[in-house]
Amino acid sequence: MKKTCVALILALSLVVSALGIQPSNAKAESNHNPVVLVHGISGASYNFIATKNYLIAQGGDRNDLYAIDFVDKTGNNLNNGPQLARYIDQVLKETGAKKVDIVAHSMGGANTLYYIKYLGGGNKIENVVTLGGANGLVSSTALPGTDLNQKILYTSIYSINDQIVANSLSRLQGARNIQLYGIGHIGLLSNSQVNAYIKEGLNGGGQNTN
């Protein structure tokens, strides 16, 4: 009887293997790029807690959400750009993805554009969403990137009530620019309306006419 049971188990194992059935705890392949969250001056990864919680509640995988902590909290492009480049390379290696998406707040927008423009990030990013981004300190236009088959799509979200970063710095020529009202600079990190636009931007709802 024991030999019969063993034989049945082996037979079932062969059938499962032949059908390509995977164990139930195997990680499903993600249909989305990993998202890198980039904070601004004096910020930190925890600034994006509300953003992460929203994306997870909308069906996002928490394992696809990465938030950098810059060593230099002053927003210096010369320091933060290279650190961001190393961080993104690490995320791509860890996940096996070809590109990442970025959500950047304040000076994080400028750091992101610096990485794209000067540090080889032009073919490693698919979607960029900036929140009150100081984008104009690096570029006033939506940089197309270096992937000839796919431009980087941008969504720039900013508020007329932002007292920290001028709207003129946040606007990107050729991007999808979204001007909101009644939200402060820090409030952009936790506003439900902003979160909805972030989701759209990460799902290819941005624009690049350049």
Where do the PLM segments sit?
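C-terminal catalytic-base region of ester-bond hydrolases, centering on the histidine
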Residues: 144-210
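Hydrophobic helical h-region of N-terminal Sec-dependent signal peptides
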Residues: 6-18
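Sec-dependent signal peptide cleavage junction
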Residues: 15-31
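Intrinsically disordered, low-complexity
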Residues: 24, 28-29, 124, 147, ...
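Bacterial Sec-dependent N-terminal signal peptides
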Residues: 1-5
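Alpha-helix N-cap/loop-to-helix initiation residues
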Residues: 44, 73-74, 137, 187
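Typically the conserved alpha-helix immediately C-terminal to a functionally engaged Cys/Sec
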Residues: 50-54
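Serine-dependent carboxylesterase/thioesterase catalytic core
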Residues: 33-39, 46, 56-62, 68, ...
